[in-house]
From Swiss-Prot:
CDD domains: CTPS_N, GATase1_CTP_Synthase. One of its GO terms (molecular function) is glutaminase activity. It comes from Rubrobacter xylanophilus (strain DSM 9941 / JCM 11954 / NBRC 16129 / PRD-1). Catalyzes the ATP-dependent amination of UTP to CTP with either L-glutamine or ammonia as the source of nitrogen. Regulates intracellular CTP levels through interactions with the four ribonucleotide triphosphates. L-glutamine binds at residues 56, 355, 383-386, 406, 462. Residues 1-267 are annotated as: Amidoligase domain. It holds the Pfam family CTP_synth_N. Belongs to the CTP synthase family. This is CTP synthase. CTPSs have evolved a hybrid strategy for distinguishing between UTP and CTP. The overlapping regions of the product feedback inhibitory and substrate sites recognize a common feature in both compounds, the triphosphate moiety. To differentiate isosteric substrate and product pyrimidine rings, an additional pocket far from the expected kinase/ligase catalytic site, specifically recognizes the cytosine and ribose portions of the product inhibitor. UTP binds at residues 15, 188-193, 224. Homotetramer. InterPro entries: Class_I_gatase-like (IPR029062), CTP_synthase (IPR004468), CTP_synthase_N (IPR017456), GATASE (IPR017926), GATase1_CTP_Synthase (IPR033828), P-loop_NTPase (IPR027417). Keywords: ATP-binding, Glutamine amidotransferase, Ligase, Magnesium, Metal-binding, Nucleotide-binding, Pyrimidine biosynthesis.
Length: 551
């Protein structure tokens, strides 16, 4: 363990200031210098995992290759590192207590009084150590804000960890917010001063401060922060809001963050290889064309609920050198055909999102119908594929009132039904989760888009296409172009004769990377561009528009 270096990223003042993207960007920069890096997120909530949490409270549930339901920050980590992470990369208070209490019940502690210190903190430290095997650098983000009562066991654990592995092997990075007060006309350092002071009260003295602001942080402000934060001026790294997420690594590299980290850890600093990343950013900023995609969902008030989809579309747009304008559509507002036609008319593509529960389902069905009848490119994700099957069954195959048993247990035509091995099982860790192989049918759209015979994709669902209806649906013109290797489970459905109409039972967005856009998203955006060009709708992006990303 002593050969591995550990970096702990904490946050102060307010939440959502960019700890996750800062940690991911630092990991990407260290990897670009040749280091083997892994990232980890500590979430201080008592839920065992976010699998059953409301998306409006938590945002997206990101699924890893090994089937863990995790925090959305793991999506940032994977996209920036371009590597798959596993369940050890997300640790919650609930999972830690679950393990410790299970050991106590088994008698593993030999009758000892089980306490936060040392039992909980030891379990936290063990999870850090296990992740560090075979890696040069472990970067661990501590969720929440310094001062939160929920985070205290994690902060105590990382304080102890420095003594456990040697002080030269641990670095503390604190991300703070420097607000601009309009009335005073200046940036204020007091919140950062109090944040670092609170951290020191817990026994942790930050080695580096990353200071978020909406404008440049001048030398005078940096000196003031350094004075009260007890760090060198060079260790105060300014992080101004960036036009896109993918500008952040280049911005932090320009501020010297990665070089400073290596210096403080006593590691060599080979040159950073950032040519491909710079090319990506140039393509994102240089897009001279724009396409509009109607995105149909029911949690659209919080776009973090679909974060990986947004990023996958951005990756595909970069590959085609177009900006993808997202038109968010509440599925409850388009539940009749006329409303759907009026709302979706002029869209270059229709994307129906995943989700659970009955609310907004009829609107999603009408969106699929509009795309099918108008020839508009369509991409359905998980439930979005099931929706396409239901719509086709009702309106093409003649299966009146066809539905999923998730929404109507009495439907006469359950074209979507629960998997047999899930009947009677409680929610929480019971779905088909993680990576599974998918065999593609030669000559189909799916096979052309992927350019492969077998692919591996990540799943998160309980319901499947009912095999009892596959033959009648295929006879009506639906093509099941991807299945499990044994042919029992439908993975991809598409329509013959349509320019681009495809749905996946899996979640392709989880495997899209900035430099390697997912084939389904790349194909979809390409089809949207073709539709826009044919209709004469390709436009230039609006001047000065940002995607809302920050560092």
């Amino acid at each position: 363990m002593s050969g591995t270096k550990y970096i702990f990223v904490t946050g102060g003042v307010v939440s959502s200031i960019g700890k996750g993207t800062s940690a991911a960007a630092l990991g990407m920069l260290l990897k670009s210098r040749g280091y083997r890096v892994v990232l980890q997120k500590f979430d201080p909530y008592i839920n065992v995992d976010p699998g059953t949490m409301n998306p409006y409270q938590h945002g997206e549930v990101f699924v890893t290759e090994d089937g863990a339901e995790t925090d959305l920050d793991l999506g940032h980590y994977e996209r920036f590192l371009d590597e798959n992470l596993g369940r050890l990369s997300n640790v919650t208070t609930g999972s830690v207590y679950w393990e410790v209490i299970s050991r106590e019940r088994r008698g593993d502690y030999l009758g000892a009084t089980v306490q936060v210190i040392p039992h909980i903190t030891n379990e936290i430290k063990a999870r850090i150590g296990r992740l560090g095997r075979e890696k040069d650098v472990v970067i661990t983000e501590i969720g929440g804000t310094v001062g939160d009562i929920e985070s205290q066991p994690f902060l105590e654990a990382i304080r102890q960890f420095r003594n456990d592995v040697g002080r030269k092997n641990v670095l503390y990075v604190h991300v703070s917010y420097v607000p601009y007060i309009e009335a005073a006309g200046e940036l204020k350092t007091k919140p950062t001063q109090h944040s670092t002071q609170r951290l020191r009260e817990m026994g942790i003295s930050p080695d580096i401060l990353i200071c978020r602001a909406d404008r440049p942080i001048g030398e005078e402000i940096r000196r003031k922060i350094a004075l009260f934060g007890d760090v060198e001026v060079d260790s105060v790294i300014p992080a101004q809001d960036a036009p896109t997420l993918y500008d952040i690594p280049l911005s932090l590299h320009g501020s010297g963050l990665d070089a400073l980290v290596l210096e403080k850890l006593g590691l060599p600093a080979p040159p950073a290889r950032l040519e491909e990343w710079r090319g990506l950013v140039r393509r994102l900023h240089g897009a001279e064309r724009e396409v509009r995609v109607a995105v149909i969902g029911k949690y659209i008030r919080l776009q973090d609920a679909y974060l990986s989809v947004v990023e996958a579309l951005r990756h595909a747009g970069g590959a085609h050198e177009v900006r993808v304008e997202l038109d968010w559509v509440d599925s409850e507002q388009i539940s009749d055909p006329e409303a759907a036609r009026e709302r979706l008319r002029g869209a270059d593509g229709v994307l129906v999102l995943h989700g659970f529960g009955q609310r907004g389902i009829e609107g999603k069905i009408e969106a699929a119908r509009y795309a099918r009848e108008s020839g508009t490119p369509y991409l359905g994700l998980c439930l979005g594929m099931q929706i396409a099957v239901i719509e086709f069954a009702r309106n093409v195959a003649g299966l009146e009132m066809a539905n999923s048993t998730e929404f109507d247990e009495e439907t006469p035509h359950p074209v979507i039904d629960i998997m047999p091995d899930q009947v009677g099982v409680e929610m929480g860790g019971t779905m088909r989760l993680g990576s599974y192989p998918c065999r593609l049918r030669p000559g189909t759209l799916a096979a052309r888009v992927y350019g492969a015979e077998v692919v591996h994709e990540r799943h998160r669902h309980r319901y499947e296409v009912n095999n009892a209806y596959r033959e009648v649906l295929e006879e009506a013109g639906m093509v099941f172009s991807g299945t499990s290797p044994d042919g029992r489970l439908v993975e991809i459905a598409e329509l013959a004769g349509h320019p681009f109409f495809i749905g996946s039972q899996f979640h392709p967005e989880f495997k899209s990377r900035p430099l390697r856009p997912h084939p389904l998203f790349r194909g979809f955006v390409g089809a949207c561009l073709g539709a826009a060009e044919e209709a004469g709708r390709v436009t230039a992006p609006a001047a000065g528009r940002k995607d809302g990303a920050s560092g």
